[in-house]
């Protein structure tokens, strides 16, 4: 078994090998979200060649920045945080949907099975909220194969895409993947 957030980290790094303009990061949770591109450095004032961004604890700004990057063009932006914090991102996600921007939102720890963080980190209504935003694709993969398929769809569709990922290990099912 493997948590889909771990599968997501593997998939993101494989995508980065083939798509050098994949650019993004996490609010302050890159190790937990598994969003660090291992063969790239952090983008900074002194290093403009990095593809990893440390946005800091400001989910709305992170999401709005990714919208701006998508509007500028040339890069494939993604950003990540715990799913419960998607509430802070909602106005910017809604704007990306209105503009049809190809931003990928990686939202981990997607259930009440999040462990020691307690009830403040247990998303209940967030998945329904994301699914209700017109023009936004929302994926909740059941395993690693569906996680890879969700990223492929997000990159192919060219619209805002939220990918909800588990913290807990999930079995790999025989009949999942692209067709699911």
Role assignments for model-derived ranges:
Residues 1-164, 168-172:
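Thiamine diphosphate
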Residues 170-180:
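Aromatic-enriched
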């Amino acid at each position: 078994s493997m948590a889909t957030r771990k599968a997501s980290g593997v998939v993101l790094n494989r995508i980065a090998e083939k798509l050098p303009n994949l650019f993004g990061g996490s609010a302050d949770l890159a190790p937990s979200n598994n969003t660090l591109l291992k063969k790239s450095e952090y983008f900074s004032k002194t290093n403009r060649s990095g593809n990893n961004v440390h946005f800091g604890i400001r989910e709305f700004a992170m999401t709005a920045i990714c919208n701006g990057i998508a509007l500028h063009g040339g890069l494939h932006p993604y950003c990540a945080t715990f799913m419960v914090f998607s509430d802070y991102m909602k106005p910017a996600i809604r704007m990306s949907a209105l503009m049809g921007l190809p931003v990928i939102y990686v939202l981990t720890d997607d259930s009440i099975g999040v462990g020691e963080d307690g009830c403040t980190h247990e998303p209940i209504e967030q998945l329904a909220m994301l699914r209700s935003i017109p023009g936004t694709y929302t994926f909740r993969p059941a395993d690693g194969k569906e996680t890879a398929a969700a990223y492929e769809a997000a990159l192919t569709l060219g619209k805002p895409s939220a990918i909800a990922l588990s913290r807990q290990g999930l079995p790999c099912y025989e009949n999942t993947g692209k067709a699911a």
